[in-house]
Amino acid sequence: MKKLFLLLIIALILGSSACAKPAPTPEAALSLQGKSILMIIAHQGFRDEEYQEPRQLFEARGATITVASSSLETAKGSLGAQVKPDLLLKNMTVSDYDAIVFIGGPGAQEYWNDPVAHAIVQEAVAQSKVLAAICIAPATLAKAGVLKGKNATVFSSEAEALKAGGANYTDASVERDGLIITANGPQAAARFAEEIAKALEE
């Protein structure tokens, strides 16, 4: 009887260990640990999903997020989101970040011809940072002169701005050319975020 009882206990132990699933490694879950990402939003009228979805993914993978804008007052999204920026765009230092991400929405026009935004874009390329923009924000990159000869996409209304800046406009939902990643609107926000994460993980 005792022997049978012992055999039953051993069988239960072996069965439970065989069914146990290995815990996911922290490295896999936090693939962006130690990475610093600057997200640039318009003071008024940034696109909510284009900010929220990438930020959620970046933070879930361990990245540190900083938000910059043209004002430190609470920024308002076109769908009602409210975000308190961490610093003024003019006070940021490109070398502090691994990626610079321009968020779109109608308000993103404020950076199209902004010399501060252009200087950030140009410095990001010079320092080999991941540089990304979504919706109408890729027009800022084009006007800053960094898309010449590059494959890029944008919200369809600004296709001509990209072409005028020398880009090869592809009309893709998400486009990557080296360390420059562009996307054409909120429906591409999740994939846009994945491409940025992939570039940072390389």
Task: Kindly label every feature range from the protein language model.
Residues 7-16:
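Bacterial N-terminal signal peptides
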Residues 8, 104, 154-156:
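Residues that line or immediately flank small-molecule/substrate-binding pockets and catalytic motifs
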Residues 148-156, 169-172:
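Short hydrophobic/aromatic-enriched beta-strand-loop microsegments
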Residues 131-132, 152:
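A short beta-strand/loop micro-motif in the catalytic core of glycosyltransferases
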Residues 1-4:
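Positively charged n-region of N-terminal signal peptides that target proteins for export
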Residues 19-127, 131, 140-144, 161-171, ...:
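Extended, subdomain-level signal for the structured scaffold at the beginning of enzyme domains
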Residues 135:
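Catalytic nucleophile serine of serine hydrolases
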